[in-house]
Regions:
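Conserved alpha-helical substructure of the radical SAM core
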Residues: 33-71, 83
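Conserved AdoMet/S-adenosylmethionine-binding subsite of the radical SAM
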Residues: 75-202
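Flexible, charged surface loops at secondary-structure boundaries
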Residues: 9-11, 62-65, 121-122
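Conserved small/polar residues in nucleotide/adenosyl-binding loops
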Residues: 203-207
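Canonical Radical SAM [4Fe-4S] cluster-binding loop centered on the CxxxCxxC motif
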Residues: 4-51
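A generic local structural motif
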Residues: 2-4, 56-59, 113-117, 158
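Generic structural signal for conserved hydrophobic packing positions in ordered secondary structure
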Residues: 17, 70-72, 139
Length: 207
């Protein structure tokens, strides 16, 4: 495992922010199992947990107006450091109109032990939430969350439904390797909560 302090990294015309390595899940398909970086990036394992100040200093070196999107997504779940995320997003909003997206597992309420959807208001343009499966059993098998005695699938869907009130665009995602039948069932779940489903091609493009 190679560690560095690559808090931001580019893929195509998008800037990704790697603000933490913490994550309460151990997804079977997670790219962290396959190497030190994502889609050709430099190592994303961090030498230490960066502060908001470190993250902001890092992105000040970037031309934020030049990107199509700025995405909180790295080798960890960004809502594990929610205060750092919010402070960083607030700075970004103060200097550019480039849209901000968060790629999340949707377990922010469990992670932070409080209701968090309203905290994203005015700071985030898009939230992409990993649905991963069409029911709780399959979800636990794929996502392998560390929270015990909790229906994480329902917690994730509840977060998705509530955060729609505060963020302009919300989407749910699955990866293509779950198969056509499971994707159809996942589409039905997304339709039931009125949220767009995106199918991501694993290992060919970041979600």
């Amino acid at each position: 495992m190679i560690k560095a302090m690559n808090i931001s990294y580019e893929i195509g015309d998008k800037l990704y922010l790697n603000i933490t390595n913490k994550c309460p899940c151990n997804c079977t398909f997670c790219i962290r199992h396959n190497g030190d970086g994502a889609y050709g990036s430099d190592p994303l394992w961090l030498e230490h947990q960066p502060t908001a100040e470190e993250g902001i200093d890092n992105i000040k070196k970037r031309d934020l107006d030049s990107y199509k999107e700025i995405i909180f997504c790295g080798y960890g779940e960004p809502t594990c450091e929610l205060e750092i995320l919010k402070e960083t997003a607030k700075y970004i909003k103060s200097v550019t109109k480039t849209p901000i997206r968060i790629n999340t597992n949707g377990l922010s309420d469990l992670i932070n032990k409080r209701e968090t959807p309203a905290e994203f208001k005015g700071l985030v343009d898009i939230i992409s939430i990993s649905l991963n499966a069409s029911d709780a059993k399959a979800y636990d098998e794929i996502t392998r969350p560390s929270f015990k005695g909790v229906n994480c699938f329902e917690e994730m869907l509840s977060f998705a439904k509530r955060v729609k009130e505060f963020v302009p665009e919300v989407m749910l995602t699955v990866v293509d390797i779950i198969g056509e039948e499971e994707i159809k069932k996942s589409q039905a779940v997304a339709d039931s909560v009125g949220i767009h489903l995106r199918v991501c091609l694993l290992y060919t493009s970041p979600s």
